[in-house]
Amino acid sequence: GMVMISVLNQLEAGGLEGLTRTSARYLHRRAEASRRAFLDRARWLGDPDFNDSIPLTRLLSKEYAATLVAATDSSKATSSLALGRDIITDRGESPQTTHFSVVDANGAAVSNTYTLESSYGSGVVVAGFLLNNEMGDFNKKPGYTSTRGDIGTPPNVIAPGKRMLSSMTPTIVARDGALVLVT
């Protein structure tokens, strides 16, 4: 949720008027906004029951989004190391996550994200589906770099009873009862 709101706030602050969805400038703005939102996610977010110092109000504010946009070069990608030398890695995309969005003829919508975390998940099958091993989404300890290249940030360090950070954001948007967007 926080990442999506941050990206939308940045896109609103930067303006998309006159840009087509396939233009280089449009795609550049979306990519740079996403990179900054995910950087803040990695740096600040974790289970809020265990992290009382998450600056969520600031991260979701339009003013903060405007500062992110102001620091973005509109003509070239920002170096990942310049954005967050302490937490940026290049792992590529996970092949174990599936997402689908469906809208039927009557406008009923479904948005579903299912992830295993790694190949074959936990290795346990129940009632016809695989159980995931999302424990891998926790950071092992602050500063620890996993074999996947994840760098541990304190808000998402593993602890009993804690919920791990997740990027899944299946979304359905309606305005005045009418479906507007499904992602």
Kindly give the residue locations of the regions a language model identified.
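Protein kinase glycine-rich loop
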Residues: S6
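Internal maturation/activation junctions in enzymes
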Residues: A13-T115, V124-V126, G136, P142-G143, ...
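Flexible, polar/acidic helix-loop-strand segments at domain edges
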Residues: M2
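Active-site rim segments in enzyme catalytic domains, especially the processed small/beta chain
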Residues: A108-R175, L179-L181
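Short alpha-helix boundary/capping segments
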Residues: T22-R25, P160, T183
